[in-house]
Amino acid sequence: KYSRKDNPAVELMRRVIAAKKKTDLSNHDYYQYDKYQKITLALNDLKKEQLEGKFFSKRQYLLDQVETSPYNGKLTLPVSIDETVSQHIYRKDPKTEKDIIKGQQSNGIGQVIQTGEILNTALKDAFTDVDIYDDYVRLLQYPFPSPIGRTGISFYHYYIEDTVYVERDLCYHLQFIPANSQDFGFRGELYVLADSSLHVKKCNLYMPHNTDVNYVKNMKIEQEYTRLDNGEWVLSKDDMIAELHVNSVLQDLLVVRNTRLTDYAFDELPKILFKGKAKVRHDMDAMNRDEAYWNKYRQVDLTKSESSMDSFIHQMENSKGFKYIIFFVKALMENYVEIGGGTDGKKSKFDLGPVNTYISKNFVDGIRLRLAGRTMAALNPHFFWDGYAAYGTKSNDWYTGNIFTYSLNKKKNSPFEF
């Protein structure tokens, strides 16, 4: 039976949690670092029978895009990649933090559906940065107790496995699991430096299989910390691998987020950098960086399929039946279908959807048929309409609804974008 009393693992973790204050970067008056992030979305776990089937065998460009993922060893088909280079700056007094986007580019399926930018934003929001030195880790819109957070001792069970060397550093190797298997928490392992700093050198976090969160089938987070010349330990590597399963009909998805943090500095920063309330600022040329820029600042190499994404999309756009494929993809990903534009470079003025509401069934209406749609910013960037008409085949009743929205700010696609 697990006991916290006189437990060496618990006593060690109490010391690790207490030592957090000494190693907090916010103790400095200023700090900054550079950050590179790559997020890849791929069809996951493709089977040999699928690839030999009629759909793939008739589309060589799809077969050429298939590769074995280095993260799960499964056959995958990358469909989008988003890269961002940014600078994070911090000032203690008055407390201010900002991210300055230096470079950003997106390639893939988002290029051929007008709201692809929303897809990239949603992925970044769901698979956000993880800092185990926070008390809670917000992930997939849920707060998870950190294994070294203030509630860690009561939430997790810890077990010392051994003392091992990680690179050249002697570390305590610990395993941890939620005390209650039904709770939202991680399981995983920590490698804690066996010196006075008691800082985490490396950690692996896993989403328990019985945690039913936003279609996540499996998730792993790998983090590594690096010692700076001044003796401080800082996060340098943060990778996240998530396998998503929606249902038995749709293909599983793989999301891989690679983050690298470099060039930490603690010099005083000019006041002008902190001007304004916006927490995120874009450099003027951030969206127009050339290949030489990305070759210089890319911290994680692209896979063969990621690097050929432009060619893949070009072949897809020129393939037979492309419009039908995009129709299906958009219906699945966004629940809306563009009417006019979208595939020829022009933005849609009107979308049909939500598609999953077109046919439904209930006790009163029997089979209920519904037609719905919405206007887009290409029609008017300030004024939007969203409405529907539905008919119950059993009740013979008609139902209608209309929503009118006016946006003060000019929108690119829909009234709900940020």
Where are these regions (language model features)?
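Membrane-embedded beta-strand positions in outer-membrane beta-barrel channels/transporters
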Residues: 13, 189, 222, 370-372, ...
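Structured extracytoplasmic
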Residues: 2-173, 177-186, 243, 247-360
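Transmembrane beta-strand segments that form the barrel wall of outer-membrane beta-barrel proteins
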Residues: 176, 204-208, 350-361, 371-372, ...
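Outer-membrane beta-barrel translocator/channel fold
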Residues: 215-216, 244-253, 405-418
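Extended lipid/amphipathic-ligand handling interfaces
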Residues: 188-194, 220-230
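Outer-envelope beta-barrel architecture signal
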Residues: 29-31, 348, 367, 381-385, ...
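Transmembrane beta-barrel strands of outer-membrane/channel proteins
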Residues: 35-37, 387-391, 418
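Outer-membrane beta-barrel channels and translocator barrels
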Residues: 195, 230, 378-380, 409-413
